[in-house]
Amino acid sequence: MEPIKAQLSNGQIVDAYPLTQAQQFMFFAFNNYGQVPATLNIGTGEYWKGDFDTELMREAIAEGIERTECFRLRFVKDQQYGTLQYIVPKTEAVIEEVDHTGLTYDESYEIIKSWSTVGVEFFEKPLNTIKIMHLPEGLNGIYVKLNHVTFDGYSTKIFLADIMAIYLNKKVGAPYPKPMKPYLDMVQEELDYLNSDKCKEDQAFWINFFQTQSEPYFCDYLRDNRLMKERVEYNQPDRRYVQCFTQKTESRQLIYHISEEDTNAVLAACNERDMSVVGVLMLGLRSALSAFNERQEDVSIRLMLARRSTLLEKKSGGNRWQMFSVRSIVDEDKTFKEATEVIEKSRDVVYHHCNYPFLKWVYLKNSVNKATLGQTYDSLTFSYHAPIELPYENAEVKKSSIGIWYNNNFSMQNLYLTIKHRCADNGFDVIWEYKLDEDGAAEDVAILHDKMFKAIMMGAKNPDIKIGEILDAIKL
């Protein structure tokens, strides 16, 4: 990949590169449904109890930044190419140390959370920051605020794991982590795909797929159903999509901590009955959506995909996330186990063709359906974060660890569900981020959560239970 010579505002010439499709989508979504700079913030912290060496952590962070090229990513405006990206070869990053030991835990949490709500100047400026934290209750660790055009949830976790491994190498002689992979190699792979036979094959597949499928159906998470209202408003009794994307971005979170016992019950059922964890979680979610929509059998969920299968993709950082609709039509006579197979089959179709650019995918989908850009058949987005082991000094330190994702108070998604595992005990943390522009959203999301996990636990306890029995138990 030949670099593009780009000129910065100070006259300096840098080697720059085009944006990937995933980055272009982030810009598209931000410009159309975001526009508040903090919308692109990822704020997260990892904290633990026990002996903590601040200076060794400072050294580890500095090495981690040098090893992870996307932390040093910058963007520049170019008259010919629009927005380009370039890497600062060496950065003297300011690693601030913050002492909150004199505060309560809640006071500290609110202050740290407020950092995540502050946007940064985008072009030709550092986009990512990291702080060494000393918290109440004997907790120490690191907080990062990263830009979503430079990191996604997966690469954020890998970056933190790399720093913690370097720290343990310095502190107790643990093995030094293997090298990270070059970010630009991943960019090259993404750009090469666009001109590849595989891209042409994927496009042909999706064209045929949409032409041979019936129109999907919008299943709302609001009890004041938007589809029913739009059918009346537009005098379209057969309408199956909704106009629900707006530039109102203010959001809040509802967070639920599922017990280690219940989480282990779900994982055990998956292992014993050969069900995928993400399939079981999605079936619980689709069951709750079905219950909210008069037991609708045709449910679509927008699934966020990390696209990190190769070593290069796992260790190169950056943002590779794309999202695709996973549609499942499940009749009530199917068992829970059989219904997971329906979801997994639909999900596998997406996985095999998930490198195709999402915006082009939406165009192909809408070209054979009635929805247009800004209208959707998916009421929410779901992301499952499989466990990524973070290194700790010993089991006691690991048990004390706390990982926190701080809401930036802004979202481009109407409803975004993330389910991840706690480092301390591997239990599920369930994070619902909802927008404030819909009355009653918080109450409805809380009800949706209860019904989702009731369905999940019923299926984990008895994978042979009928879907109709689950819907009877979780009906509104």
What spans do the regions from the language model cover?
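Active-site-proximal acidic secondary-structure segment that organizes catalysis
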Residues: G11-Y17, T129-D185, A442-M458
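Acyl-thioester-dependent condensation/acyltransferase catalytic cores
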Residues: I65-K145, T150-Y154, A161, A165, ...
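Flexible, Gly/Pro-enriched loop and linker segments at secondary-structure and domain junctions
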Residues: A38-G43, F71-V76, V118-I132, V172-M180, ...
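Hydrophobic "lid/gating" helix adjacent to the active-site nucleophile
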Residues: I61-V76, A268-K315, A460-I467
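AMP-binding/adenylate-forming domain of the ANL superfamily
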Residues: V14-N31, D106-I111, T156-K157, T249-A265, ...
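Short amphipathic alpha-helices and their capping loops
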Residues: M1-G34, E59-L103, P126, P182-S251
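Acyl-thioester-dependent acyl-group transfer interface
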Residues: P3-F25, A29, Y33-I42, T54, ...
